[in-house]
């Protein structure tokens, strides 16, 4: 039981770390010395605000920002709820509330990464016209199945002695 518990905690913490990296880091799109994340366009010397990022034209970018932040927050809240339920649940009960929170986090990651995949090319400046997806984008997509599997594990898991 302790091995399963340690594995689930490690899996959850790894998911949270991946979500933090994907949300904060500036490598969603890369082209040479330029990189773009959800917040800034950067070159080798400085970072600049994304043009028109606060306008209606950038609604997709704001949706990606919101869903990735929400996914990260839900993943962290889910971990604290799991720890709380670990001490409060009766023997034999399932971690349903934690599972729901973690599955919502997975849904938010999937939504944010999907929107960025579909709309990422429509808003980037000329310097990102032929850019490649960066590692933060890949990390976001890796975080999706990890949070999904974590949520499903919580759904199946029962509290034992």
From Swiss-Prot:
UniProt note on tissues of expression: Expressed in the arches, orbits, pectoral fins, vessels, pronephric renal tubules, and glomeruli.
Keyword Electron transport attached: no
Principal location: Golgi
Domain of life: Eukaryota
Gene Ontology biological process terms, A to Z: positive regulation of cell population proliferation; regulation of glomerular filtration
UniProt keyword terms in alphabetical order: Cell membrane, Cytoplasm, Golgi apparatus, Membrane, Nucleus, Transmembrane, Transmembrane helix
Classification via InterPro entries: PMP-22/EMP/MP20-like, PMP22/EMP/MP20/Claudin, PMP22_EMP_MP20
GO CC term, one of those recorded: apical plasma membrane
Membrane topology annotation: Multi-pass membrane protein
Transmembrane segments: 1-21, 67-87, 95-115, 137-157
Cellular compartment(s): Golgi apparatus membrane; Cell membrane; Apical cell membrane; Membrane raft
Gene3D superfamilies reported for this sequence: 1.20.140.150
Biological role stated in the UniProt entry: Functions as a key regulator of cell membrane composition by regulating protein surface expression. Also, plays a role in regulation of processes including cell migration, cell proliferation, cell contraction and cell adhesion. May play a role in glomerular filtration.
Membership in a protein family: Belongs to the PMP-22/EMP/MP20 family.
Record-given protein name: Epithelial membrane protein 2
Phylogenetic placement of the source organism: Eukaryota, Metazoa, Chordata, Craniata, Vertebrata
